[in-house]
Swiss-Prot record:
PANTHER family: SOLUTE CARRIER FAMILY 2, FACILITATED GLUCOSE TRANSPORTER, SUGAR TRANSPORT PROTEIN 1. It is found in: Membrane. Keywords: Membrane, Sugar transport, Symport, Transmembrane, Transmembrane helix, Transport. Coiled coil: none annotated. One of its GO terms (molecular function) is monosaccharide transmembrane transporter activity. The keyword Chaperone does not apply. Residues 1-25, 477-523 are cytoplasmic. This is Sugar carrier protein C. It comes from the Eukaryota.
């Protein structure tokens, strides 16, 4: 019987395509991964400006009065405002809609066009937000930012997975998540310094500064080539063959090119990719496209990264200290993501998922205990001793590092690499849509939940971390070292998913199961 969850490739009948990690493909993937900057910058910048007094006074005066009132006796509820929540969460609803539209554009016109749309729309949103004079302008700008993120997040992970040699796909794809973390860090640093600008207009620089990462991905999408997979899908066979040789750095690409053509021919037989997603043989893929982004958001990470300054201010750090603490967590996020780049193709996806889950679970429980011990259930305000603040920040940083080398990058990598070409664009849109929907939900209810659940909010998220770790252990196959167009084979050997997939669905052979889900050394 197959080992629980593990579907490692073997050296037997697994195809091995020749190719190297060339400078060309490395530079191409690095430029494309810059699409993550816009998402990361927004996550970092928005939470920071909502902790700036000048921003709150101009757009959310009721929140500012509540925050400053001496009679306030509940630290947990000082930021509870539906208007403030709508400012932060409207972006994700727009991103959800855009990701569905992006599926058709990505499939019919190529990955890079969707990346271009993402950059242009995000740039427009940044201009409106930086010049905002009323709340409606802020929300309009956020909606345009969301459209940009929806297009970029749908296309960039696909681009990276298709462009990278299969042996290095994990590391190159995680460049997208690394760019997200760099965007968060840069935003946190800028917030810290812009908040000190006299006159209270630093928030305009923070919001308007989003133009910079938007211009990077816009220009990048104009100079990048499209992927061989996308070229073949659109009938550009000769260009695709020549491009594949350059990408792989070898002349012998016949076998891989032939397999890509066959995959494209199969995909053209599919008239309705959205409807095809519901077929029984795609049940495993669809389950992962829904479960992974759902669980990723229920780790609570966007609560930490998006609302970090607000959260730290709430638990007694003060405004400047809160912004600096957010910078510290941003630094941890970047360096921990680099660990994932090193380890994802060495240790595998499942190991990182499970280790990160255990780490996050322990840290959330400790943070909940620390906050509960300090503020209790009534949220009574008071100064936070320095040593206490250090302990809270330390365990939040350990929590962030656990996410940064597991659910952060793998939440984008695994869904983008498991889909066959005929449903890949549609399935990636499902993945992004689910991600954005639950990001919207969490952002919409977080401040309310903080007010009512208090320190129990961290217990709430830790429960889902436990559930998602169990899910990964039993239901997620190992996808390390498998060519992207061969990925369907892993489901045939899985102890559970094999009941939905038959030999006729993937007629080109199978993959053998290793003991205890371990990957043989010859991979």
């Amino acid at each position: 019987m197959p080992a629980v969850g593990g579907i490692p490739p073997s050296g037997g009948n697994r195809k091995v395509y020749p190719g190297n990690l060339t400078l060309y493909v490395t530079v191409t993937c690095v430029v494309a991964a810059m699409g993550g900057l816009i998402f990361g910058y927004d996550i970092g910048i928005s939470g920071g400006v909502t902790s700036m007094d000048s921003f709150l006074k101009k757009f959310f005066p009721s929140v500012y009065r509540k925050k400053k009132a001496d009679e306030s006796s509940n630290q947990y509820c000082q930021y509870d405002s539906q208007t403030l929540t709508m400012f932060t969460s409207s972006l994700y609803l727009a991103a959800l809609i855009a990701s569905l539209v992006a599926s058709t554009i990505t499939r019919k016109f190529g990955r890079k066009l969707s990346m271009l749309f993402g950059g242009v729309l995000f740039c427009a949103g940044a201009i409106i937000n930086g010049a905002a004079k009323a709340v409606w302008m802020l929300i309009l700008g956020r909606i345009l930012l969301g459209f940009g993120i929806g297009f970029a997040n749908q296309s960039v992970p696909l681009y990276l997975s298709e462009m990278a040699p299969y042996k290095y796909r994990g590391a190159l794809n995680i460049g997208f998540q690394l760019s997200i973390t760099i965007g968060i860090l840069v935003a946190n640093v800028l917030n810290y310094f812009f908040a000190k600008i006299k006159g209270g207009w630093g928030w305009r620089l923070s919001l308007g500064g989003a133009m910079v990462p938007a211009l990077i991905i816009t220009v990048g999408s104009l100079v990048l080539p499209d992927t061989p997979n996308s070229m073949i899908e659109r009938g550009q066979h000769e260009e695709a063959r020549a491009h594949l040789k350059r990408v792989r750095g070898v002349e012998d690409v016949d076998e891989e090119f032939t397999d890509l053509v066959h995959a494209s021919e199969d995909s053209k037989k599919v008239e309705h990719p959205w409807r095809n997603l519901l077929q029984r043989k795609y049940r495993p893929h669809l389950s992962m496209a829904i479960a992974i982004p759902f669980f990723q958001q229920l780790t609570g990470i966007n609560v930490i990264m998006f609302y970090a300054p607000v959260l730290f201010d709430t638990i007694g750090f003060g405004s400047d200290a809160a912004l600096m603490s957010a910078v510290i967590t941003g630094l941890v996020n970047v360096f921990a993501t680099m660990v994932s780049i090193y380890g994802v193709d060495k240790w595998g996806r499942r190991f990182l998922f499970l280790e990160g889950g255990v780490q996050m679970l322990i840290c959330q429980a400790i943070v909940a205990a620390c906050i509960g011990a300090k503020f209790g259930v009534d949220g009574a305000p008071g100064d936070l001793p320095q040593w206490y603040a250090v302990v809270v920040v330390l365990f939040i940083c350990i929590y962030v590092s656990g996410f940064a080398w597991s659910w952060g990058p793998l939440g984008w990598l695994v869904p983008s690499e498991i889909f066959p070409l005929e449903i890949r664009s549609a399935a990636q849109s499902v993945n992004v849509s689910v991600n954005m929907f639950f990001t919207f939900v969490v952002a919409q209810v977080f401040l309310i939940m903080l007010c009512h659940l208090k320190f129990g909010l961290f217990i709430f998220f830790s429960f889902f971390v436990l559930i998602m770790s169990i899910f990964v252990y039993y239901f997620l196959p190992e996808t390390k070292g498998i060519p992207i167009e061969e990925m369907g084979q892993v489901w045939k050997q899985h102890w559970y998913w094999s009941r939905y997939v038959v030999d006729e669905d993937y007629p080109n052979g199978g993959l053998e199961m290793g003991k205890e889900g371990r990957i043989p050394k010859n991979v």
